Structures are given as structure tokens and as C-alpha cells.
Curated annotation (Swiss-Prot):
Catalytic activity: ATP + H2O = ADP + phosphate + H(+)
This protein's UniProt keywords: Acetylation, Actin-binding, ATP-binding, Calmodulin-binding, Coiled coil, Motor protein, Myosin, Nucleotide-binding, Phosphoprotein, Protein transport, Repeat, Transport
Domain (Myosin N-terminal SH3-like) ranges: 8-60
N-acetylalanine modifications at: 2
Species: Mus musculus
Record note on quaternary structure: May be a homodimer, which associates with multiple calmodulin or myosin light chains. Interacts with RIPL2, the interaction is required for its role in dendrite formation. Interacts with MLPH. Interacts with SYTL4. Interacts with MYRIP. Interacts with RAB10; mediates the transport to the plasma membrane of SLC2A4/GLUT4 storage vesicles. Interacts with FMR1; this interaction occurs in association with polyribosome.
Region Disordered, annotated ranges: 598-634, 1105-1134
Annotated protein name in UniProt: Unconventional myosin-Va
Amino acid sequence: MAASELYTKFARVWIPDPEEVWKSAELLKDYKPGDKVLLLHLEEGKDLEYRLDPKTGELPHLRNPDILVGENDLTALSYLHEPAVLHNLRVRFIDSKLIYTYCGIVLVAINPYEQLPIYGEDIINAYSGQNMGDMDPHIFAVAEEAYKQMARDERNQSIIVSGESGAGKTVSAKYAMRYFATVSGSASEANVEEKVLASNPIMESIGNAKTTRNDNSSRFGKYIEIGFDKRYRIIGANMRTYLLEKSRVVFQAEEERNYHIFYQLCASAKLPEFKMLRLGNADSFHYTKQGGSPMIEGVDDAKEMAHTRQACTLLGISESYQMGIFRILAGILHLGNVGFASRDSDSCTIPPKHEPLTIFCDLMGVDYEEMCHWLCHRKLATATETYIKPISKLQATNARDALAKHIYAKLFNWIVDHVNQALHSAVKQHSFIGVLDIYGFETFEINSFEQFCINYANEKLQQQFNMHVFKLEQEEYMKEQIPWTLIDFYDNQPCINLIESKLGILDLLDEECKMPKGTDDTWAQKLYNTHLNKCALFEKPRMSNKAFIIKHFADKVEYQCEGFLEKNKDTVFEEQIKVLKSSKFKMLPELFQDDEKAISPTSATSSGRTPLTRVPVKPTKGRPGQTAKEHKKTVGHQFRNSLHLLMETLNATTPHYVRCIKPNDFKFPFTFDEKRAVQQLRACGVLETIRISAAGFPSRWTYQEFFSRYRVLMKQKDVLGDRKQTCKNVLEKLILDKDKYQFGKTKIFFRAGQVAYLEKLRADKLRAACIRIQKTIRGWLLRKRYLCMQRAAITVQRYVRGYQARCYAKFLRRTKAATTIQKYWRMYVVRRRYKIRRAATIVIQSYLRGYLTRNRYRKILREYKAVIIQKRVRGWLARTHYKRTMKAIVYLQCCFRRMMAKRELKKLKIEARSVERYKKLHIGMENKIMQLQRKVDEQNKDYKCLMEKLTNLEGVYNSETEKLRNDVERLQLSEEEAKVATGRVLSLQEEIAKLRKDLEQTRSEKKSIEERADKYKQETDQLVSNLKEENTLLKQEKETLNHRIVEQAKEMTETMERKLVEETKQLELDLNDERLRYQNLLNEFSRLEERYDDLKEEMTLMLNVPKPGHKRTDSTHSSNESEYTFSSEFAETEDIAPRTEEPIEKKVPLDMSLFLKLQKRVTELEQEKQLMQDELDRKEEQVFRSKAKEEERPQIRGAELEYESLKRQELESENKKLKNELNELRKALSEKSAPEVTAPGAPAYRVLMEQLTSVSEELDVRKEEVLILRSQLVSQKEAIQPKDDKNTMTDSTILLEDVQKMKDKGEIAQAYIGLKETNRLLESQLQSQKRSHENEAEALRGEIQSLKEENNRQQQLLAQNLQLPPEARIEASLQHEITRLTNENLYFEELYADDPKKYQSYRISLYKRMIDLMEQLEKQDKTVRKLKKQLKVFAKKIGELEVGQMENISPGQIIDEPIRPVNIPRKEKDFQGMLEYKREDEQKLVKNLILELKPRGVAVNLIPGLPAYILFMCVRHADYLNDDQKVRSLLTSTINSIKKVLKKRGDDFETVSFWLSNTCRFLHCLKQYSGEEGFMKHNTSRQNEHCLTNFDLAEYRQVLSDLAIQIYQQLVRVLENILQPMIVSGMLEHETIQGVSGVKPTGLRKRTSSIADEGTYTLDSILRQLNSFHSVMCQHGMDPELIKQVVKQMFYIVGAITLNNLLLRKDMCSWSKGMQIRYNVSQLEEWLRDKNLMNSGAKETLEPLIQAAQLLQVKKKTDDDAEAICSMCNALTTAQIVKVLNLYTPVNEFEERVSVSFIRTIQMRLRDRKDSPQLLMDAKHIFPVTFPFNPSSLALETIQIPASLGLGFIARV
């Protein structure tokens, strides 16, 4: 189409920019033909006038739509040009953190300078088996493509990794080799893949160095061939090296280092084994200090040295050789420190006893004088004579450096040879994959011979690359049958001819090297004369006559001629080499052997490979004087030959290209420098690939994809039934130029830009449709708005009018109401006035009447009171007369009472003082409060008595005073009468005065007594109040303490309960982890056994020697040769003679190291399995103990010994009782039976006596077992370990006998040494275990002795207590118990104070001992119950026998006829649930029931688990017969046969499910009928009678449990193999909801798949397969809990594989795909609901996938969205969330991408989340399986044996 159609307004273009290389801009107006200027708007907001080139008129490059940016394949872009490629790489690298991108057949890898979690084994598993175009670009995808093409096309492959130094070539090659090592595995036990990977650290240490561009730059090229056998497993490898940079050994530029190995040696100089090397710091050596940068940040040279030595050991380089290598390297360092002193201009000398040279000679084992001489002289040979010439100081220094380089190069080649020998395999190589790690195009300021060779190699590789790309394009066009047009591409053959043709640059250089006086200047002149102005690719610099310029495919490079000849000749003095060859150090002459030995045909072809597998690379030029032709080859000639061989190898293989890009020169992580990137893209051929693709038809669509995408551009009438014709018709209308597209068989091919044009048409059509939709919707919205407003206006009018009417009605109501209110109000006012007046009148009347009534009352009252007064006065006068009479009596009483009061007062004073003392002594004592209170009460009583006395005294005093007053008055009145008695008056006055004085004294005493009483009362009250307050405080404190104690107890209880719950959960988690580890070990053990069998089979096939009796057949059962034992315990029970393989071992030398490793590994696994089992038992016991701890704690300390003693006595009494019953039964039998029947010779008598005798013996045995209970506890532990050691020694002895039969003496010696070390190790282990067991036994003996003493003491105390009366007995027992507990607590406190750990261990041991004793006693109980059952059975048989004989024998027959056995027919109900078979029929039973049984017929026609029931019934019969050999043989054959069936038909789900179900049922039967109480409680009484009576098969239960675990793991593997091809297609690729997922909006160049589509799977396919699995398991009668576990594992596999592929496929991360995934998950959940499996935990395994689907669907813009995502995606790791957001790709241009800032926000919010950094889920993870006990209700006696099983030789019993 015309440019005017493309360059329209708003079109975006790319314009050149000096800083950013390319800058984006937008057109501000349409372009018209003839315009000289384009008006552009830049992204930074500026406007620009862009002038077009007036000569060419070329328009700027158009920019791809945003929807196309970030594509996985650069060739999928619509516009293919440099800015589009650069921008796409930048967006993927910076925004999406994606370092890999496809460019056609090339994988572009950008070095992130950061460790990324994308190379783990989970990533390898995700890419394994996938098509290259289905997954995101990755080095693993390229490796997988190469591996699949090798297997499919039977053609060797090559992976060519190139790029600048620091671009990541070595790392990419390393990851490719790791992928091959992981997915293929090795064909032997020697772990070849580990050796291949181990070669990397060795080669990096001797071939890598730090440069200014890279800290780990490879300074050599290498091509590694990884060999595979016919089964495509790694068998070996071979390495070729190219152009080692030898000059780095003697010179390093600023900020660079020498090879890593030198610094590693210096860092490890302090190791004892390196003392002899006399090394020091790297700065002390001339060859390591020139760069001034001896350290690399983040690298520990000492650790790297340890890794290097470890790798050397793994590759078989012995310790002596390693020390030899280090010795030579140290010698090179010391040689660099050798200094020269000038004598004159032409000669020099070395100082005498020069220390560096002395150390060098000592290390190299050469003569000091000789080496010193030839370092300063050289030998010249002419045609007639030879003479020695001294050399100058400069020449001597150059010779020294040349010698150092030569030694290092020889050592490098020697190490490469030994690495190749270690990687060599004796198995014939079928195919190989080569990995080429070679330097990319280089150009520096000064370019020399090394850059010339590197760029020459890149010219050859680029030519091969161009031819391959051209070939692939041609094949694609021919495949689609479209017209082939010649594509013009750059051909660099002229440049190659300039370099390597006759009279080319290399040819002239070799010719100049042959000239005696050839120089760099003369060589330059020859170049100018030959090629200047004759070859367009050769130029001469203007300002130099010692340089030349070559126009390479990438850029022009100017080479300096100085040094070309010297480097090409690589001259080393012959005399110096001779001195080294004469070294006493044996390893040094090996380095200088003739090159013929290094490339001998035998060494190249001995392994059956082509001679190209070992090619000598860049050997140095031979010394002067040698005549061999190959030693005269120059470095350039050798490099050209090796390069030709390399190109021949690459041309014979299918190449795969990896181009590594260095994003910046500063090693900043995820920093993209556009200038440097463009330079490398041009140099590595990526842009050439783009140009070739753009010249053809880069965009390719299938017809269905095109129709789905551009259906909007078609009219209804254009759509036909034939989609292909529809697409043709539409394209002819849309694109008029038919040259812009071509129709292939399955695809439409578009030229560059056509898809973008179609996208523009589609966008325009959609935009026009959007405008029309918007117009219609806007009109509809406005009309809808108008109608709404109209309805609103009418509604408002209606409501307003209604409101007005309501207001008027309200006015009328109010008017009427006001009139009514006024009427009633007026009436109310008048009525209230009337009521007030009436009330006032009533009040006045009431007050007046009251006044009159009160006056009348007063008058009556006065009269009444007058009468009373008169009565009172008269009474007073009478009393006064009486009082006067009593006066004298009262006075006497007063005197007496006063005297008594004084006495009482003194007494009270004394008591008061005693109270004060008591208070001082006992104040504050709470315990005396009650006594004080009582005394206070007594004092109060006394006080009251005193107060009453005082009151009486006052009364007497007052009465006396009154009497005296009356007397005085009377005397005064009768003074005259008293004159006669004057003397009497005086005496009376004196007496009055005396009485007054006494009265005053009494008053004062009364006052003091009252004061003291008040004071005492106050003090007493204060004391009481204080005591009450203190008592209150004490009570409060007591309540507080009680409350605190209760709270603390509650908190402690809660804490203990919470801790117990947490510990229980942790123990359960630990139990699951241990169970998982144990089951993984079982899986590893099975894998090793299978590998062992495979090795034996391969050895047999390799020998091609027929072996009688061991030839494998196609039947379901094979010979014993392919059997593998299950475990060490199981192996002990097998009665199989050891097999020898003398015919094989005598004819073939076996790999003894392989057998020793295998035997050692098997032994280790068996020991680890036993340890894991013990640990598992311990964990389960710990969980049990934690649950029962609270219940059993009160009983642990006190009742152990009593319980044991009483239980033993009870058992002994029970045994005695049983024995008595047996004797009574025997006596009764002898009395009741007829004499003839019970005669000693009668058969019945003999049968009965034998049975009774056996029962009696059994009882005696049980009694002895009870008596030796304690000894058993001690001996059980001692009997286990020696048994294991004995088995180990037996296995070692058998292996030694096998080894001694081999012929190879070297291997026998090696095996003997290994066995000696093994025996020494076992002996030391045995001695240590013996000592520990002896110590433990001694401790147990001491404990037993102490327990015996304690038991005796307890018995004595018990006997004493029994003699006491009941009350005293109880008191004595309590006292004894208190004493015992006190002593025990004191002992424990002392023990805890002295050693808490010992105290804790003592408690644990005590508890364990009690548990063990209880278990032993429980076992004895069970034994007694079994004996009772046997007695009952015998009694029943005896009764039946008596009755049967009495009924069937007549009296005459008793006398005359001999007794013969009578067969009594039994009814069906009398069957005992056992099956009888002969021992010789055991193999037939196993064959018919296991080996040749078809699960389908059994599952459909018979009861589930029938084989398990039959086998158990046979075991029951063998147990009934007490035949341990028969039980062992049957169980062993059963287990081995099941293994054989699963090994033969292990890929059949139905078979594996069938035998998993039957194995579990067999295991449940062994538990159900074991006789253990925990299993018997679910049985019926009849089933309990069927329990095993003679054997405890607990060990076989463990063996069967392990077998069931292995079968379960195999079932999971079968499930995974069946489901894996369906999951990605059904869950991700298939459109379950049609029309939701849009087609990719570009002509996505779907990379050609190496595997054709094998059919499309849908979600229905997965559901049908799940239904099939479920129905098969149900038909086989699998336990429901086990089915739930299988379903959970299936759903985990579905979720993990789906999520992993989602995280590795950018095209699947879209909104529509999230909806599809969510719908698919809902269908799976619906399936779970239909099957009633929602509680199986399967739904939870899909939670990560559900959250990933939700993450694709939610908004991803604001901070709130980020918060919602962080809270929602709790089942996804941070790496997974960020990966999904980075991969999120809109399906169309109307959807926005996730911004980088939003992703950063998510990362910031999730930075504190502690989760795994792993990106992918472990799809290989298997949940630990458990087999919950599921008893069967099926009665064994009712089971019928179908005739179809062919088991007629067994009989029901």
C-alpha cells in the first residue's frame, strides 16, 4: 500500500538519535508524497521538524503497535527493523525482567548480572518434553529442542553459543549441559553427568580470567561433545579447545588478572600440603601482580580451590597428579620472578643462587646450573657447525616468558586430555550433542593476532549461520508449497577468501614466518602489494604502515601487524625444553611427549567413535631441529585446520544458535545500554536474521487464526463454509498488491508490515463500530433521560397539588378545633373560680371550729392537772419523812462503799498497767486478736460495774447533802432551841466540813477514774480499729494472692494447653515430614534396586553369553535374577540360596568400583531406612505420649513397682488356675471316657494326650516368659544391633567371594582395599556399639537391683500393714506414702539442683520404663487370653470327640472291632475361615493368584480384595499348623510376586491400582486378625475366633506397609504420565468458553514444532480420565481414605503443572485466559462434589492456580488494587505474583499493560513475606501416604473360591 496510507496523523515512527540510537515520535499531520519535512511530536513533549533525505527520500521506520511489543519472537513483529528489535529487547529486559528472546532460530540471551531463580530442577522438568514455541524463550527450550531432534531424526546436534566477553556464553553453555545431564541421566552408576558438570570448574580455573569486561572471562574456545547411547542416556563426553590466550600467563593489562588457578594457589598457600610449593601472596609474583587487581569481589579463591580439587577427584585425577599440577603451576609463578642482569648489550646473567630460579628448579626437578645457562644462552645450528650464543637481557626475558607460556599450554592440553579420558566411555556412542562455547566478534583499540583469529572464526560461523537460516526459510516455503523467490543476503565468502585462500593473509603470514629474516614490516608490505586496491574488503590506514583494515560482516577492524609473526611462530628454545624433559619430576616429561602419541589413532578410535572425537587443538610450534612435519605447523595453520574440522562437524549436525548480549560495560544488573546492544546485535547476526526474515514472509498465520482475528473485517455474505476460501476472498479485497501475501497449504504468509496494516484496518473498523455504538447509546441515554425528567415533573406537580389540598384541609380542621377549645376553656375558668371560693369558705369554718374546741379542751385539762399536783405534793411530803428516817443508814453504807471503791480503784490501776504492757508486747499480732477482744470485753464489763458504783455513790451523796441542808435549815429555824446544844452544833459543823472535804476528794477521784477509763477506752478502741484494719488488709492481700494464684494457674493451664496443642501440631508436622522422608527413601531404594537389575541385564546382554535358568522371557514373571529384595529385614526371612555368576565374572572384567558403590549405597539406604523407621516410631510414640501425658502423670511415680508386682502375681495365679483347670479336665476326661477309648494305646487317647501335653508345655513356656520378663527387657536391645552387623558382614563376605572369582588382578586389589576399609569401619562401629550396649546393660542391672530392693521393702511394709487393724493400717499406709513421696521429692530436688539435664533424662527413662513394662504386661495378658481360647477349643474338641465316639460305637464294636478314625461331615457354617494347601503347591498358588491374574476380570466378577482374603486364609492355616517355614515362604513369595507383576506391568493403572488395593486389604487383615486389642475391638465374636494364635507378624506388616507405599508411589507416577499430556492442553490451551479468549493480535511466528500434534485434549478429556481412575479404584475396593489421598495427589499434579506452564508462557497470561482457568477449576470442583470428595483436601491443592486466575482478572492500577492482590494471593509466592504481573499481556490494544511502578509497589508490600524464592511448584512432589486401619466386615468362613481362578488344589478348612 502507499506510504500515504501508513504515514497518517498519530502514526508513530522511529527516528535516529545520537544518544539513544533510536527515539520514538508521533506524526502531527498526514504525510503526502513530495513532502520534504515531517512534523513530529517526541515522547518528552517536544515538537520536531524531521527532514527527509533529499537523495533517497526514505521515510523513518514505522513503530509496531503497543500490543505487539514484548513478543517472545522478534520475527513475530510486523515491522522488522533495527529499532523495533532493540525496543522489543529493551521492554522485555527492563520492564518484564525477561533475559531470553527468540529471533527466528536464534535465542538471544541478555546477561542480567544477577542471579535469577530460573535454572532450578523444577524449571528443567517444566521444559522437558515441551515444544519449543509453546513455552517462553529459555536456554532449556533450546536444549530440549536439540535433545528431541537427536532422538527423532537420529541426527547429531550442535548448540553454538557466542557473544562478547562477559555476555554469559560460559554460563549458557553450562546450563545447557546441566539440562542434558538432568533429563537424560547416565547409563551407568558412575554418574557421567556429574563428571561432565564437574569439568566446568576445572576448565574455568585454568582457562578463565578476570578482564575489564568480565570477572570470569573464558580465554579459550571449547566444543564439548556429550555422547548418548541408543536409549539417549549420557554415556560420556569429549572436549576440544581452541586458541588459548597464552600471553595472559606472562602479561595482564590494568585491572585484569591472570588465570584463576594461580590466585587460587596463592590463597591456599597456607595449607599443609602446599608448604612445599613455597608460595605467598599473589602480589609477590610478577605474573600475578601486573594487573593490580588480585581480588574479585564476592569470590573466595580458597573456596574455589577446594571446588577445583573436588572436581579433579571426581574426574579421577589422583591426588599425586593434582599435586603435580599445582607443582608445575607454582614453578611457573617462581619462573616469572627470575631476574636478569646485563653484562653488555648482547649478553646477560642471572645472580648466583638466585632464589626464584632455585625454587623453580627444585619444583621442576631440573639442574640449576643447566637451566641458568640456557636461560641466558641459545644454540644456533648452521649447515656445518653448531655454536652457543649469549642473548641480551630483553631476549632472555622474552625467552623466559615464552617458556612459561609453553609450559602452561602443555599443562592445559594435558589436563584437557585427562578430562577427556575421565569422560570417555567404553559403551559405543550412538549420537552426540555438541555445545560450542566460542568467543564472539571482538574489536578493541589495539587488535592483534588473537583478535584476528577470533574474528576469522566468527566469519566462518556467520557464513554457516546464514546458510542455515536461508535453508530453513527455503524448507518452510517448500513445505507450504508457495513460490520460492531468491532472498538476497550478505555472503561473507569474499572475506573468508581474503583470509584463508592462496596468497591470503594467513598464507602470506606463514610464508613470512619461514623467511630467515622475516619481520612484521615486510609482511605488511607484502599484504599491501597483494591486496590493496585489489580487494574491496582490504584497506590500509592513512596514518600507519604497520596496520591493515578488514571489512568484516559486523564492522571494520584495524589490526596492528606488530607481534603477528612472533605469535604465529610461537618460538621456544629447544635447549630449555630438553632441560625440562630431563627432569626427575616424572610428570613434567609427560607434558612434552611427541604429538604423535597425543593423537594416535588407537586413542581416537578405541571407543568405537569416529577419529574426530579427539582432535589436537593449537599445539605449539615444534622446536628447531625437529624434522617431523606436523611440528613445523604455525599457530595460524593449526587454527585454520582445527576450524575446518569444527565446521565439518557443525555442518554434519543440526545447529541451534544462542547469541549472548552484554547489556552494559559496568556490570549493572538489568541496565540496558542501547549503543552497546546495537553493536552486538549487528556483530552476532541477529539483525541479519531479521533482514533475511523481513525479505521474505516473516508473518505467518493459520487460516483459522486469521479468520478468528479478522472476522470483523468480513461481511456476512463473505463468510463461506470453506474457511480457506473465505480468507482468500477477504485478503484480495483488503490488500490489492498480491505480492504482499501468499497462500500456503496451512498458513497465510505476509510480508513485513502487512499484519500491522491489517491491524490498522481492524482498529479502524472497531473504532468506527465503537463510534456508531456510542452514538446510538448516547441518543438512547438522552431520550431515556428526557422521559425520566418528564415523569419526574408530572410526579412533582402531583405531589405539590396534593400538598396544597392537604394544607387547606388542615386549616379548616384547626379553625373548628380552636372554636371548640375556646368554649371549653371559658367554661373551665369560671368553674375553677367557683371552686376556689368554695374551698376558702370551708377552710375558714374549719379553723374557727377548731379554735373553739381547743379552748374547751384547755379548761378541762387545767382542772385535771390541779388534781394531779395535789396528789403529787402529798406523796412528796410522805416520802420526805421517810427519807429523813433512812438518812443515817445510807450514810453508813456510803462510807463502807467508799472504802470498797478505793480498793477496787487500786485493783483497776494495776490491771490497767498490765494491759499497757500486754499491748506493747503483743501489738500487731494477728493471732492474739481474739484474746485481746475477750479481755476488752471483760474490761468493759468491769468499767460498767465501776460506773454503776459511782452512780450509786453520787446518789447517796446527793441524798445526804439534801438531808444535811434540811437539817441546817431546821437548825437555823430553831436556833433558839439549839442554843442549848451549842457544843453539838460545833461538832456538827466540823463533821460537815469533813464531809465536804471527803466529797471533794471523791469528786476528784471520780474525775481521774473517768479520765483514765476514757483514755483506756480510746486506746482500746484504737487498738481494735488498727487490728481490724490490719486484719482487713491481710484478708485483702490473701484474696489478692488467691486470685493471682488462680489466674496464674489458669494462665499456666492455658499456656500448657496451648503449648501442648502447638507441640502436638509440630509433632504431627514432624511426623508427616519424617513419613515423607521415609517414603522418599523407599522410592530411592527401589530406584537403586531397579538400576542394579538393569545393570545386570545390560552386562548379560553385553556379553551375549547364554545363561541357563536366567534368560528373561515375555511372561509376567521372570527368573530370580531380576528379583530385588525389599529391605534388610525382609532379606533375612528369605530362604534363597545365594546365586553366583561365575560364567560372567570369569569372562568379563567387572567395574568393581561400580559394585562397591552400589553395595555401599544399598547398605546405607537400608540403615537410613531403619533409622527413619525408628525415628517415625519415636515420633508417633511422642505424639501418643503428649496426648496421654495429663492422664498418666499422677500415676507415673507411685504405682510402677506395685503395678508390676501385683500384675505378675495375678498372672502367676492365673496360670496356676489354668493349670488346675487343665488337670481337672484331664481327670474328668479319664473318669467319663470309656476304658477302651481312654486306654493308653487308643488312638483317641493318644491324640488327646498329645494335645493336652502340648498345651501344658505351652503353659509352662508362658509361665517362664512371665518369670523372665525383666531379663527380656534388657536383652531385647542387645539382640538387635549385632544382628544387623552380622547381616552386614554376611553381605560383605558374599560380595568378597564374588569379587575373588574375577580375573582382573587390579580390580581385585582395589576391591580388597575397599573391603579392608569397610571391615575396619564396621569393626570400629561394632566396638563402639558393644561398649555403649555394655554401659547400658550395666545401668539397667543397677536399676533392676535397686528396683528389687525397693520391691522387697515395699512387700515387707505391706506385710506389716496387713497385720494392723484397719484404722491403723490406713494411717500407716498414709504415713508411709507421705514419707516415700517426701524422700522422692527431696531426691528429685537434689538431682534437679545438681544436674537438670540428668533429672530430665531420668524422668524420661523412668516414664519409658513404665511404658515398656505396661506393654509387656499387656502382651502377657494377651498371651493368657490366647491360652484360654486354646483351652476352650481343646475342651470343645474333646467334648465333640466323646459324643461322636459314644454315638457311633456300639458295645459290641467296642470289644470286638478295632478303633478306626471316623470322618464327620461338616456343615458350611462350621468352616474355620482357613484354606489348606500343600507346600509344593505354593508356586502354583502364587502363579495363578498373582502372576497370571487379570485384574479386569477379578474386579468385575468377584468380590473386591479376594486375592488378599485368599492369601490371608492360607496364612491362617499355616499359623494354625504352627509351621513357621510355610508362613515365611508364603509371605516371601507373595511379596516378590507382587513386585514382579508391578515391574512387568507397572505402566498399567488398572494393575497397579488392583494390587495397591489388595496389598492394603492384606495388610488390614493381618492387623484385624493379629489378636491385638486395638484391632480386635472392631471385630465380631466370630472374627475374633479367627485371630492368629502362634505367630506375631508385626514385622511382615511393616514390610507390607513399605510395599504398599512403593505401589502407591508407582500409582502416582502412572497417574502423572497419563495426565501430563492432557493438562496443559485441557486446562490452558483449549477454549472451554468459546469466544472469550482472543487470538494473538499478530502474525505470531509459531516456531516449527519438533513434535507433531498428537491430538488436542480438552477439559472433558481430563474429567473422563478422572472418572476412569475413580471407577477403577472403586471397582477394586480401594479404601475410601486411600482414594481421597490419590485424588488429592491427582489434583495437585493438575494444579502444579497448569500453574508452572502459566508462569512460563507469556501468551497465557491474559484476562480472558484467567476466566477460562477459573471456569476449568470450577468444573474440577464440581467433579469433586459429584464424587463426594470435597473433604479430601484436593480443592486446597488448586488454591495457587485459583489465585493465579484471579490475579489475571483483577484490576492492577491503584494502591488499593495492590493491597487487594497482596491479601488475596496468600497461596502464591512473591516470585510467582511478580512473574504473573510481568507476563501479563493484553489480548487487544484497548487493554492497558501492568505498569512497572505497580509491580514495584507489589514487591514493596510483599518484601516482608517469608516464603520460598522458588518460582515453580514441585510437580514431582508426592504427599506422604498413610493407610488408616479399615477392618472388613466380611466373614472369612463365607468366602467361596471361584473355579475361574484355577485354585482347585486348595481346600477350605
